[in-house]
Each structure stands twice: as C-alpha cells, then as structure tokens.
Amino acid sequence: MSDPVRVGIIDHGSGNLHSARRALRQVGAEVIVSNDPSALLDTDALVLPGVGALAVCMTGLRAMGGARLVRQWVDEGRPLLGICVGHQMLFERGRERDVDVKCLGVLPGVVEELPAERLPHMGWNTVTPATDSALFQGVQERFYFVHSYGVVVTGPHDHFTTATHQGATFVAAAEYGPVTSTQFHPEKSGIAGLALLTRWLNQLS
C-alpha cells in the first residue's frame, strides 16, 4: 500500500480550514494545517482556502509569508489547489467594493462583481468543462457555490471550466499547469465534491 498524499493547508486567517481538512482526510490524504510556510514545504501538495473579502485574504496571506510560498511552489511545478476566495487570489487582480486588490498573478484574469441582478450566487450549480479538462470531463454533478465575485469569461476556454448564474458566465474551476482551483466549495459539495478531491489526489500519486 502506498503512503497517503501529504497535503498542506495554508492558514492565512480567512479560510474554511476545518471543512477542507475533514474532506481531504475523508478521501485518504494526510493533512497538515499551518500558518508557518516552512512547515508546509515538506508536503506533496498545497491547498489555498479563502472566505470573505479578497483584500483581507490577500493581506493575511502576505503577512504570514504565504504569497511568497505560493509563487515559489507554483514556479517549481508543484501541485496546488485553490478554493473559493483562494481560487480568486490566484488571478492577477480584483476589484471588490471599489477597492483594487493586487493578487498572486498565477492565473490570467480579473476578479469582479458578477453582472447579475441577484447576488450572492448561492446554492448548487452545474459546470461546463474546459476543452482540455482532466477533472471535469463527463461530470454531470452539481457543486455548491457561495460568492458574489468571480472571473467573467466569454466562450470556451482550454483551461477554465465555467458556470453560469443569471446569464453571467464565470470561471468555476481552473486547471493550469500544476494549479487547480475552484470557485465552488468541493468540501461542501457532498459526494460530488469528495469525488473531485479524489480525482485531484489521484493525479498526484
């Protein structure tokens, strides 16, 4: 029997740490949660969670050395999973409540308020897989979203799996080199979310 995948969850002060840790353990990962970058270096993959305001998450991440850790990690081609605001933090920048936020610049795109009459987008939604998706091809399940901001896209994309809320199509997930990220919460998406996390872990082993 092979050793479990060791996953480090970055604790920058604004994330669903308990839910993410529990879900990853359910699918067989060994999980370490830490706000010390040096404690996370000896893992097989990182998870960048995030809830609340993008600016607050970025400030917390920079303060604990996580921004430098993420960029170094991705530059080395090591696998990383962003969740919800953690997904948004991976893009170039964001604009939230008239505040411009410089993000990590790992993924191309800008986070903005979704052009929809009813916000937040909260509840279950289906996704349209990216043309070269390894994780979502053939997936019919719905995933749990709760957000008002996202990266709006038009048309099919090689790296972005999309979802639509009230006519606004946005990035629901990204698969970009070593980086995977989801706007939805896999850890709150029941069986579908656990299956997705299992597929992600299987890519690492």
UniProtKB/Swiss-Prot annotation:
Catalytic activity: 5-[(5-phospho-1-deoxy-D-ribulos-1-ylimino)methylamino]-1-(5-phospho-beta-D-ribosyl)imidazole-4-carboxamide + L-glutamine = D-erythro-1-(imidazol-4-yl)glycerol 3-phosphate + 5-amino-1-(5-phospho-beta-D-ribosyl)imidazole-4-carboxamide + L-glutamate + H(+); L-glutamine + H2O = L-glutamate + NH4(+)
SUPFAM superfamilies to which the protein is assigned, alphabetical: Class I glutamine amidotransferase-like
CDD domains the record matches: GATase1_IGP_Synthase (cd01748)
Record's subcellular location: Cytoplasm
Domain Glutamine amidotransferase type-1 intervals: 6-205
Pfam families according to UniProt: GATase
Annotated signal peptide: none
Active site feature: 84 (nucleophile), 185, 187
InterPro entries in the cross-refs: Class_I_gatase-like, GATASE, Imidazole-glycPsynth_HisH
Alphabetical keyword list: Amino-acid biosynthesis, Cytoplasm, Glutamine amidotransferase, Histidine biosynthesis, Hydrolase, Lyase
Transmembrane segments: none
Protein's GO biological process: L-histidine biosynthetic process
MF (Gene Ontology): glutaminase activity; imidazoleglycerol-phosphate synthase activity; lyase activity
Pathway: Amino-acid biosynthesis; L-histidine biosynthesis; L-histidine from 5-phospho-alpha-D-ribose 1-diphosphate: step 5/9
One Gene Ontology cellular component: cytoplasm
Its EC number(s): 4.3.2.10, 3.5.1.2
Subunit structure comment from the entry: Heterodimer of HisH and HisF.
UniProt function note: IGPS catalyzes the conversion of PRFAR and glutamine to IGP, AICAR and glutamate. The HisH subunit catalyzes the hydrolysis of glutamine to glutamate and ammonia as part of the synthesis of IGP and AICAR. The resulting ammonia molecule is channeled to the active site of HisF.
Protein's name according to its UniProt entry: Imidazole glycerol phosphate synthase subunit HisH
Lineage start: Bacteria, Bacillati, Actinomycetota, Actinomycetes, Propionibacteriales
Recorded name of the encoding gene: hisH
